[in-house]
Curated annotation (Swiss-Prot):
Function: This protein binds to 23S rRNA in the presence of protein L20.
Species this chain originates from: Streptococcus thermophilus (strain ATCC BAA-250 / LMG 18311)
Record GO cellular component, one term: ribosome
PANTHER family attached to this UniProt entry: 50S RIBOSOMAL PROTEIN L21 (PTHR21349), LARGE RIBOSOMAL SUBUNIT PROTEIN BL21M (PTHR21349:SF0)
Molecular functions (GO terms): rRNA binding; structural constituent of ribosome
Complex and partners: Part of the 50S ribosomal subunit. Contacts protein L20.
GO terms classed as biological process: translation
Keywords: Ribonucleoprotein, Ribosomal protein, RNA-binding, rRNA-binding
Alphabetized Pfam families for the sequence: Ribosomal_L21p
Family of the protein in this entry: Belongs to the bacterial ribosomal protein bL21 family.
Taxonomic lineage: Bacteria, Bacillati, Bacillota, Bacilli, Lactobacillales
Name of the protein: Large ribosomal subunit protein bL21
Keyword Ribonucleoprotein: yes
Amino acid sequence: MSTYAIIKTGGKQVKVEVGQAIYVEKINAEAGSEVTFNEVVLVGGDKTVVGTPVVEGATVVGTIEKQGKQKKVVTFKYKPKKGSHRKQGHRQPYTKVVINAINA
């Protein structure tokens, strides 16, 4: 059974495995740099370790592959018969990270 981990990043929990590419909330670092996730909630595999609230000494190491923005989300508010409308767009920034190692 392959080793996996559940990490907390950007206010979310993400299940990761070695070699997997994940999309997370923007991390302020350059593409190609290494990032370490210290908030590991669970490490699974042959023996599962559940943290209370995090697993002590466990880290997940990844490499930032690219920074980008998601597709545009358009919101439109409209009041009928009043000539009132408002259109607003938003593109959420993200970071693509490739997981290199799970250290338990």
